[in-house]
């Protein structure tokens, strides 16, 4: 997207739309994401309530960001009508925002519902995964790969009806043709399929991700776990599934058989979504037992869910605090590397520029970096590609941003985050139902009942759960260039 006069002037949607304020009145904030905010809104003509996702155009830096938003809207329209996919009502644009109006899901997140209910069994997990894999099958049958399935992306329309579960976020979804191979690394670390990390994948990756969700639903923890993001990736590529630790000795063989079929490392041998739905463990009146699972499963599920929520809040704080000045700093860096002022960085310019910033990367690593950043495969990196490749990675873990996020929670400046301060932050972020004791318990390594800065940083670096890992697998640009 051209930056003439700022991208606010361009039509992201390709045409002028009616003003959203003529049709809807915007209400209170429901949530915050990397690119914008979701509000409650009311249709003026009918009084019906909807959710409105307002995307900040200022943050759509590259052409790819704009295409992602357009594609998300197209895919939501394309999938409209499937009962477990959120219904889009319309999309609108003004000089500052793109607004997507959709069905309101006020019943809360999937994990929260499981935890609140208390009684939980394999049968209940089977009912839930049947809905999730049903969404995958619907997407695949219509030529859509989701690419970012995770529990947070499933909400209940009504908190008393588990069958009202809806998939809500299609921001990373793409259209695919049979046999088409994808290379960009996207998704969330705990859920990513091995072939995605190897940059050679298709729709089978969605079934792997659903298999990870099923493992968590039954045991309370993810199957591939480590202290760092790289450690998680290594575990995913190794593919060893733990069926020995508690609660697995008490879990049915049929459940384990299904998980093995979904978490098969070879995509060609993995179950399809259709095969999963026909598995005896999942079928109606199937073999999934209805006896209560060990209470420790719910307890672990609470801790895993709670830690992710704290991390998401911290990432929002960081994303919102990125200033025009910081983007300007990256602009200067781009200019310094673009020595011939052509508006694009060649391989040689990138290599020379990284050397100036103290990098010791090998040529092959610089080539990988170049490929990851070169979105349009032109052989060079233009300004938009450079900003997109660097802003989403380096900003999240830079020391000053982690410190400012920590200070956001540490309201009294004591050097510790307490349960009261977390409560205050949750209220500010509209996340009042988070299980705060479990957040503290999970993150607090020295068991003093509060979170210090070291514990906070360790949590943030344990598998970032942001909206996308796009390009973050090429960690070296952050370590060698931008942290200077």
UniProtKB/Swiss-Prot annotation:
Keyword Metal-binding included in the entry's annotation: yes
InterPro entries: CDPK_Ser/Thr_kinases (IPR050205), EF-hand-dom_pair (IPR011992), EF_Hand_1_Ca_BS (IPR018247), EF_hand_dom (IPR002048), Kinase-like_dom_sf (IPR011009), Prot_kinase_dom (IPR000719), Protein_kinase_ATP_BS (IPR017441), Ser/Thr_kinase_AS (IPR008271)
Active site: 148
Stretches the record annotates as Autoinhibitory domain: 288-318
All residue ranges annotated as the EF-hand domain in the record: 325-360, 361-396, 397-432, 436-466
Domain Protein kinase: 24-282
CDD domains per record: EFh, STKc_CAMK
Binding locations of Ca(2+) 3: 410, 412, 414, 416, 421
Binding annotation for Ca(2+) 1: 338, 340, 342, 349
Keywords, comma-separated and alphabetical: ATP-binding, Calcium, Kinase, Metal-binding, Nucleotide-binding, Phosphoprotein, Repeat, Serine/threonine-protein kinase, Transferase
SUPFAM superfamilies: EF-hand, Protein kinase-like (PK-like)
Regulation (activators, inhibitors): Activated by calcium. Autophosphorylation may play an important role in the regulation of the kinase activity.
PROSITE patterns reported for this sequence: EF_HAND_1 (PS00018), EF_HAND_2 (PS50222), PROTEIN_KINASE_ATP (PS00107), PROTEIN_KINASE_DOM (PS50011), PROTEIN_KINASE_ST (PS00108)
Binding positions (ATP): 30-38, 53
GO molecular function, one term: ATP binding
Chain positions found as Phosphoserine: 188
Catalytic reactions of this protein: L-seryl-[protein] + ATP = O-phospho-L-seryl-[protein] + ADP + H(+); L-threonyl-[protein] + ATP = O-phospho-L-threonyl-[protein] + ADP + H(+)
E.C. numbers: 2.7.11.1
Residues engaged in binding Ca(2+) 2: 374, 376, 378, 380, 385
Binding site for Ca(2+) 4: 444, 446, 448, 450, 455
Role according to the record: May play a role in signal transduction pathways that involve calcium as a second messenger.
Family the UniProt entry places it in: Belongs to the protein kinase superfamily. Ser/Thr protein kinase family. CDPK subfamily.
Domain comment as written in the entry: There are 3 contiguous domains conserved in the CDPK subfamily: a kinase domain, an autoinhibitory (junction) domain and a calmodulin-like domain. The autoinhibitory domain (288-318) inactivates kinase activity under calcium-free conditions.
Listed name of the protein: Calcium-dependent protein kinase 26
Organism name: Arabidopsis thaliana
